Amino acid sequence: MKYTVDTHTHTVASTHAYSTIHDYLPIAKAKGIKLFATTDHGPDMADAPHFWHFVNLHVLPRVVDGVGILRGIEANIKNIDGEIDFPERYESRLDMIMAGFHEPVFPPCDQATHTQAMINAIKSGRVDMISHPGNPAFPIDIQAVVKAAAEYRVALELNNSSFSHSRPGSEGNCRAIVEAARDMGAYLTFGSDSHVAFSLGDFEHCHRLVTEAGFPAERILARSPRALLDFLESRGRAHIPEFADL
């Protein structure tokens, strides 16, 4: 299967990343990526952009040379209540919100706390997808989290970089998440988690896991722009007419 959507990328606005949005566009074109989300880290990360960066994403064109750009954020889950580090009053400025755990904001503790925090973020209604839920630094009750994600229609990310360099030891957890999502009716999204444009759309490990698990293609949001956009609209996000022809 050809995947044409990447929901997780970073730019130089997160200063441990090395590409601009402009850098991503020719790579997207060359790789057949029709839609990607710019999702820099939420403001509570030490080197993240100020929240004005996200508020001002409306200056970006919707489509450049046939490639769509979604305005997003990888917010931080801050506490056991599932709160995130982006002001709710500005949420309408974004097309999507991804949220996850990052050690500088939420120090790892115990499985019960991680699980409750993630489930509360899912239940909050503010989060469209959970980033790298298979991170072994933050063990969770996978069955409980996937059940909540299915019930509240929040996508779970398969993060391709988790299998290579970012979060060693993730594969077993990710496999269990895929299998639970398959059985419980949850949605998956694929993220390259690119911190440099060259890795945009790299999903080889994600594809391998869903293929081995027999995960249904119709619940993989990376398969087409329409699949992702319909999912976001079903969660109450705004219709984006400029993406009609992607």
From Swiss-Prot:
> What residues bind Zn(2+) 1, as annotated?
8, 10, 74, 193
Family as reported in the entry's similarity comment: Belongs to the PHP family.
Enzyme Commission code(s) on record = 3.1.3.-
Residue positions annotated to bind Zn(2+) 2 are: 16, 41, 195
Please give the positions of the paired cysteines in each disulfide bond.
Answer: none
Which residues bind Zn(2+) 3 per the record? 74, 102, 132
Give the matching PANTHER family: PHOSPHATASE YCDX-RELATED (PTHR36928:SF1)
Which UniProt keywords are given for this protein, alphabetically ordered?
A: Hydrolase, Metal-binding, Zinc
GO CC terms: cytosol
Superkingdom of source: Bacteria
Give the molecular function GO annotations.
phosphatase activity; zinc ion binding
Tell me the Gene Ontology biological-process terms attached to this UniProt entry: bacterial-type flagellum-dependent swarming motility
Q: How is the cofactor bound?
A: Binds 3 Zn(2+) ions per subunit.
Q: Which Pfam families match?
A: PHP
State if Cell division is listed as a keyword. Answer: no
| Organism field | Aeromonas hydrophila subsp. hydrophila (strain ATCC 7966 / DSM 30187 / BCRC 13018 / CCUG 14551 / JCM 1027 / KCTC 2358 / NCIMB 9240 / NCTC 8049)
Cofactor(s) needed, names only, are: Zn(2+)
Note whether Transit peptide occurs among the keywords.
no
Give the matching InterPro entries. Phosphatase_YcdX_put, PHP_dom, PHP_phosphatase, Pol/His_phosphatase_N, Pol/histidinol_Pase-like
Quote the HAMAP family the UniProt record gives: YcdX_phosphat
Under which name does UniProt file this protein?
Answer: Probable phosphatase AHA_1344
